[in-house]
């Protein structure tokens, strides 16, 4: 057993050097991928937050009106038609998660129009 304070030169074998290089390369790759994913997620969040917030607010107003008026069947229908599955259907969004429509989401617009009619009756 050698003393840790010995002046003996530590020699690494080629396999140890290869392993260390591989480990450092993998760690660098993983750090790069993680950073890129984090940046991409943040950009997506920043872009989608205002759209999602507006959708939630609009849909909440629709549900609130129907509940407030005691329109149980209409509310059930609205919840079905304005479900997240339908709101986020592929026909309304590009592969980059941008809306394919301009202005108000078409399903929300339909319900806003229905409520406008109800208010006039």
UniProtKB/Swiss-Prot annotation:
UniProt keyword annotation of Nucleus present: yes
Location of the region described as deca-GX3 motif in the Swiss-Prot/TrEMBL record: 28-68
GO CC list: cytoplasm; nucleus
Keywords from the UniProt entry: Cytoplasm, Nucleus
Matches recorded under InterPro entries: Essential_protein_Yae1_N (IPR019191), Yae1-like (IPR038881)
Pfam family, one: Yae1_N
Oligomeric form and interacting partners: May form a complex with LTO1.
Listed PANTHER family: PROTEIN YAE1 HOMOLOG
Protein name per the record: Protein YAE1
């Amino acid at each position: 057993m050698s003393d840790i304070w010995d002046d003996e030169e530590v020699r690494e074998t080629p396999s140890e050097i290869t392993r260390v290089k591989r480990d450092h390369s993998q760690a660098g790759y993983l750090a790069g991928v993680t950073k890129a994913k984090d940046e991409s997620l943040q950009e997506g969040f920043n872009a989608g937050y205002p759209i999602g917030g507006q959708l939630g607010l609009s849909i909440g107003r629709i549900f609130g009106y129907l509940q407030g008026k005691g329109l149980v069947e209409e509310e059930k229908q609205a919840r079905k038609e304005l479900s997240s599955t339908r709101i986020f259907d592929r026909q309304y969004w590009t592969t980059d998660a941008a809306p394919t429509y301009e202005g108000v989401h078409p399903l929300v617009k339909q319900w806003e129009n229905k409520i406008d009619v109800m208010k006039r009756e």
